[in-house]
Amino acid sequence: MTEQRHNHIPQEAFDWYDEYAHGLMDRRTFLKKLGGLVALGYSMAMLSSALLPNYALAEQVSFNDPDIKASYKTFDSFKGHGEGKGYLVEPANLTGKHPIVLVIHENRGLNPYIKDVARRLAKAGFIAFAPDALHPLGGYPGNDDEGRAMQRSMDKQKIQQDFIAAAEYIKRHPNSNGKLGAVGFCFGGYMVNYLAAVDNKLINAGVPYYGTPAVKELRQNIKAPLLVHLAEFDKRVNATWPEYESDLKAHQVPYTMHMYEQANHGFHNDSTSRYDEKQAELSWQRTLAFFNEQLI
């Protein structure tokens, strides 16, 4: 996998994209700001290439890899949207008991990058299940802007209940060893923190990548060990860390936090120029080691 960072793009452009992608800046303002860079000599084509995802770059494990098998499963979500759907990836020729990892997408639905993350976990010997929050609206639409708009239009409380239902569903997998981990990115990082806090028996280990914490009143419930990945340039999420860390310490939650130098929010996502190959691979090796330690 070739590193996708565009070091010649001003950091401000990545910051603006982060605000736009998380609903803190409207599209008109975002494009106007990019237009200011065009006036300085940057081409809009180059900026678009640098900021928008190219999912052809994100496939590290093919869907037809002989070491895995993938399928889609639906599950009941009575407190959520009624029914959920997820991408289940298992090691091929599955026998015996295996740990399970819930894989939680960003704020735009189950895109190809997150599906590939699930395949990477199965390739490493885990059973992986990646639900799609957009299933009630027909599923991930094929592009991130529309996916973000769809997810933003949905009831957040019901989405949270759908992920609780997904965790409860996949824990009943016949080949489960009884341990469930969760890894999530951006919104998914928040969901990992939320699942750890809303029911301290739901997950056994959590890995939030650049995710905000659960609301303060729930944090006292957290028991699962956490491996927290943060990016140096992610001012929005990093601003929430000092208080969250203080609460984790106060409630004696076992945790480790890694701050990845010169990395942006989304540095693990190899479909965008925010991808940092070195930091992404380091964080992933730490993630696999953590799950092997906590779930096996």
Residue spans for each PLM region:
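N-terminal cap/lid segment of alpha/beta-hydrolase-fold proteins
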Residues: 57-94
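Short beta-strand/loop motif that positions the catalytic acidic residue
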Residues: 228-230
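Cap/lid segment of the alpha/beta-hydrolase catalytic domain
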Residues: 134-157, 266-271
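N-terminal secretory signal peptides
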Residues: 1-29
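Primarily recognizes the serine-hydrolase "nucleophile elbow" in alpha/beta-hydrolase
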Residues: 165-223
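Alpha/beta-hydrolase active-site loop
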Residues: 149-172
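N-terminal export signals
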Residues: 18, 29-53
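Short beta-strand element of the alpha/beta-hydrolase
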Residues: 97-106
